[in-house]
C-alpha cells in the first residue's frame, strides 16, 4: 500500500564545497574538457557531468556549487568526480573536501484538488502568501522543518529549502495533518 509520502520525488539537490585552492578560471576552462566559461555572463566555470547528471559551478575562490543532481548520493558522487578531474589537471585539492547540502527541491502530491483560497485563510496569513493574479500557487512557510511549500490547486506541491530528504516527508505529513484538521481535505 502506498502512502502520501511515496509521492515525494527529489527534483534537484544543491550542494557546495570548498576546494581550498584559488583557481585561474580562464586556464581551468581551457584545460578541463567540456567546461564553459564566459565571465561576461557568469563569474564561474560551468562544468557539466552526464553521470550523474549535474552541473558544477566553480569559482576563482575555490568554492564550488553542484546543482541538478537528483539524490544526495548523486551530488556527493558528482563533486567527487569534479575533484578527481581537477586533481588530474595537477590542481592540489585536499582529500575529501566537505560537501554541504544547501537545498533539496522535491515534488509531491496530496492526490486531490485543493481550494487554495480556503487554505490561505485556514492556515493564517502570517505563514502564507497567496496572490493568484501573480502566481498560481500558495506559498506556505514552515518553521520545523525550515522549508517552503508551494501548493497548487491540482493538489501538486513543491517543497524547497530542506537539507535532507526527510525534511520533505515531514513537511508533507504536517501539511496533510493541518489541512485535515481544518476540514480542507477529503
From Swiss-Prot:
Ranges for the Sequence repeats: 10-86, 101-179
InterPro entries: TBP, TBP_archaea, TBP_dom_sf
UniProt cross-references to CDD domains, sorted A to Z: TBP_archaea
Molecular function as annotated in GO: DNA binding; DNA-binding transcription factor activity; general transcription initiation factor activity
UniProt keyword terms in alphabetical order: DNA-binding, Plasmid, Repeat, Transcription, Transcription regulation
Superkingdom, taxonomy of origin: Archaea
Stored SUPFAM superfamilies: TATA-box binding protein-like
Cysteine disulfide partners in this protein: none
HAMAP family for this protein: TATA_bind_prot_arch (MF_00408)
Biological role stated in the UniProt entry: General factor that plays a role in the activation of archaeal genes transcribed by RNA polymerase. Binds specifically to the TATA box promoter element which lies close to the position of transcription initiation.
Membership in a protein family: Belongs to the TBP family.
Stated name of the protein: TATA-box-binding protein D
Organism name: Halobacterium salinarum (strain ATCC 700922 / JCM 11081 / NRC-1) (Halobacterium halobium)
Amino acid at each position: 500500500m502506498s502512502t502520501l509520502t511515496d509521492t515525494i520525488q527529489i527534483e534537484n539537490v544543491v550542494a557546495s564545497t570548498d576546494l581550498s585552492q584559488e583557481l585561474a578560471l580562464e586556464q581551468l576552462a581551457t584545460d578541463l574538457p567540456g567546461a564553459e566559461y564566459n565571465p561576461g555572463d557568469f563569474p564561474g566555470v560551468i562544468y557539466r557531468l552526464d553521470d550523474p547528471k549535474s552541473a558544477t559551478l566553480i569559482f576563482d575562490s575555490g568554492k564550488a556549487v553542484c546543482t541538478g543532481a537528483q539524490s544526495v548520493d548523486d551530488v556527493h558522487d558528482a563533486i567527487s568526480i569534479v575533484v578527481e578531474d581537477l586533481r588530474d589537471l595537477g590542481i592540489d585539492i585536499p582529500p575529501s573536501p566537505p560537501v554541504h547540502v544547501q537545498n533539496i527541491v522535491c515534488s509531491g502530491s496530496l492526490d486531490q484538488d485543493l481550494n487554495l483560497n480556503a487554505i490561505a485563510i485556514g492556515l493564517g496569513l502570517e505563514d502564507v502568501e497567496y496572490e493568484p493574479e501573480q502566481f498560481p500557487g500558495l506559498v506556505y512557510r514552515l518553521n520545523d522543518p525550515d522549508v517552503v511549500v508551494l501548493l497548487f490547486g491540482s493538489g501538486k506541491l513543491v517543497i524547497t529549502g530542506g537539507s535532507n530528504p526527510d525534511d520533505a516527508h515531514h513537511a508533507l505529513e504536517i501539511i496533510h495533518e493541518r489541512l485535515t484538521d481544518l476540514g480542507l481535505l477529503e
